[in-house]
Amino acid sequence: MQTRNTFSWIREEITRSISVSLMIYIITWASISSAYPIFAQQNYENPREATGRIVCANCHLASKPVDIEVPQAVLPDTVFEAVVKIPYDMQLKQVLANGKKGALNVGAVLILPEGFELAPPDRISPEMKEKIGNLSFQNYRPNKKNILVIGPVPGQKYSEITFPILAPDPATNKDVHFLKYPIYVGGNRGRGQIYPDGSKSNNTVYNATAGGIISKILRKEKGGYEITIVDASNERQVIDIIPRGLELLVSEGESIKLDQPLTSNPNVGGFGQGDAEIVLQDPLRVQGLLFFLGSVVLAQIFLVLKKKQFEKVQLSEMNF
């Protein structure tokens, strides 16, 4: 009897642990995946629209700076660094999905020219691996190896993200040529304001959906508010739901207008995009340039020697 009770207790504990773990996973996934560039994979075939706008801006409404550093030129079949910088104040805290305050995460999407791709691990130097850290990059699509995404990752550790990039070789890829190419980047810090289905997150301002008098503000048990607005002209009631984590700007009995902010703006993050240019350099052209420069240097040396020889001849003639 005691053994049966023990097994029953173990079964209940295992079931409870699985349930709690599943709930944590669902909440975490919902609060993270819908707020970073990696989520665009599920909704957009290409992250860059025809207008040049990167689609991450559809969910991250605030504009913030982002920067990218790449070499001016690279040789074919070589590995180089593309460093994306996402600056922000490390002291800032954002509103999380559970209504609490937490640190900001960052994410980025890097759009390379056709043929450029993520460098394989065996081609990455130890120095570059140290800069990369524990980051794990993904292709935007299996057939789009030139578009890379990363995130969410801790912003305090990865406000600078180093992408290891392998340059293509026109000798093996006939679609690639020795030209100047553009590189586009988008980077965000913090959660988004709009979910892909168009609904708001709890990281944005909530406005009144009707004008009138606030007759009641109900604080919900699990956080958040229900604000009842009564239209004085027809006594129609409207209830606005405010999610947890937001600070109210209104109170009961107050008269408000349509679209008037009910909460303060909690967003401390934002999205930005930038671009850079890189030249895929022909090695023969480099060799030709070096040969030309060497020829110029030798010519200068010979001119100097010839001048000195001429001066010696003149000096000897003057002595006679």
Curated annotation (Swiss-Prot):
GO terms for molecular function: electron transfer activity; heme binding; iron ion binding. Purified from leaves as a water-soluble monomeric protein with a mass of 28.16 kDa, cleavage occurs after Gln-287 and separates the heme-binding from the membrane. Keywords: Chloroplast, Electron transport, Heme, Iron, Membrane, Metal-binding, Photosynthesis, Plastid, Signal, Thylakoid, Transmembrane, Transmembrane helix, Transport. It is a single-pass membrane protein. Residues 1-35 form the signal peptide. Heme binds at residues 36, 56, 59-60. InterPro entries: Cyt-f_TM, Cyt_f, Cyt_f_lg_dom, Cyt_f_lg_dom_sf, Rudment_hybrid_motif. Its cofactor is heme. Binds 1 heme group covalently. PROSITE patterns: CYTF. It is found in: Plastid, Chloroplast thylakoid membrane. GO terms for cellular component: chloroplast thylakoid membrane. One of its GO terms (biological process) is photosynthesis. The chain crosses the membrane at residues 286-305. Component of the cytochrome b6-f complex, which mediates electron transfer between photosystem II (PSII) and photosystem I (PSI), cyclic electron flow around PSI, and state transitions. Belongs to the cytochrome f family. The 4 large subunits of the cytochrome b6-f complex are cytochrome b6, subunit IV (17 kDa polypeptide, petD), cytochrome f and the Rieske protein, while the 4 small subunits are PetG, PetL, PetM and PetN. The complex functions as a dimer. This is Cytochrome f. It comes from Brassica rapa subsp. rapa (Turnip). The gene is petA.
